[in-house]
């Protein structure tokens, strides 16, 4: 329910789990070995068509790849207008082979993106619904340098320890990409000379935030592979979009977190410097996503 009352809660959409027909065997941001993050820019005036295409593609992928991959869809609400995000959660890189095989050989899948979806608008499919050349993919794996599970204790077939091993018990259920009401993807580029310290700082920051806001914010750490070296990602799973304000309050008003952030980490130009000295300036971005809602009745 939408409200124009000042201070009223942001109207919430169902969590991404509502996009799925079944929850058994679900792979999420806390259980995946890697996440393929695909982004596409919707052409202006084609938002409803983009949502319909995304739902149909997602439904088919989850049906055909149910044991190997779970795809969840989100819309960017703070950042770039009109961008769709797909998070394809997999256990290992080899599972990507099934996806490629489906794209190349599955006739029903090909019909979804080749058939005429715009008969009343001059014809066409995704190539008109989305801006050409706007699709990009990043591959993220859970940050495993500080995970509580050692690499030699991995389950058979696992790539790295899933992100759930980063998290200490809080007395509240952890949020993940299927249960969160909103998802913030925070991305930052570590300086090469302080790359290990940057990872450790984010681990300390993550641990503090999870303890300070249990059941409200769950932070999980990832890093990019097959892309930019030392580009780090924090997946901030929020109970609702309103809790983005709670995150801001923690970073600006919580004395314990402020002390952690101000703690000298590295020396720059002979001066002890806090967390900012670990990262390339002006590279930290927050992309705020909401789960794609069900179609309107």
What are these regions (language model features)?
Residues 2-262, 266-297:
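Short S/T/G/P-rich N-terminal loop/turn motif that feeds into the first structured element of a domain
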């Amino acid at each position: 329910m939408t409200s124009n009352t000042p201070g009223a809660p942001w109207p919430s959409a169902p969590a991404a789990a509502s996009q799925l027909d079944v929850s058994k065997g679900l792979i999420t941001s806390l259980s995946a070995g890697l996440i393929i993050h695909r982004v596409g820019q919707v052409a202006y005036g084609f938002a409803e068509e983009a949502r319909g295409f995304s739902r149909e593609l997602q439904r088919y992928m989850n049906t055909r790849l149910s044991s190997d991959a779970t795809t969840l869809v989100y819309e960017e609400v703070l950042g770039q207008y009109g961008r769709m995000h797909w998070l394809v959660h997999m256990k290992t890189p080899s599972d990507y082979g099934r996806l490629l095989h489906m794209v190349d050989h599955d006739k029903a899948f090909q019909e979804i993106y080749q058939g005429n979806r715009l008969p009343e608008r001059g014809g066409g499919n995704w190539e008109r619904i989305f801006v050409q050349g706007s699709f990009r993919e990043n591959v993220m794996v859970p940050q495993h340098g500080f995970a509580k599970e050692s690499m030699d204790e991995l389950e058979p077939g696992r790539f790295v320890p899933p992100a759930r091993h980063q998290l200490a018990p809080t007395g509240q259920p952890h949020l993940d990409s299927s249960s969160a009401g909103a998802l913030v993807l925070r991305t930052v580029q570590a300086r090469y000379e302080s790359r290990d310290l940057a990872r450790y700082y984010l681990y300390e920051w993550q641990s503090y935030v999870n303890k300070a806001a249990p059941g409200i914010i769950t932070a999980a750490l990832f890093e990019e592979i097959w892309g930019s070296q030392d580009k780090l990602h924090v997946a901030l799973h929020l109970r609702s979009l309103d809790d983005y304000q709670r995150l801001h309050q923690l970073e600006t008003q919580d004395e314990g977190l402020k002390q952690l952030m101000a703690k000298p980490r590295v020396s720059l130009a002979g001066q002890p410097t806090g967390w900012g000295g670990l990262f390339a300036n002006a590279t930290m971005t927050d992309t705020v996503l909401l789960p794609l809602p069900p179609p309107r009745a």
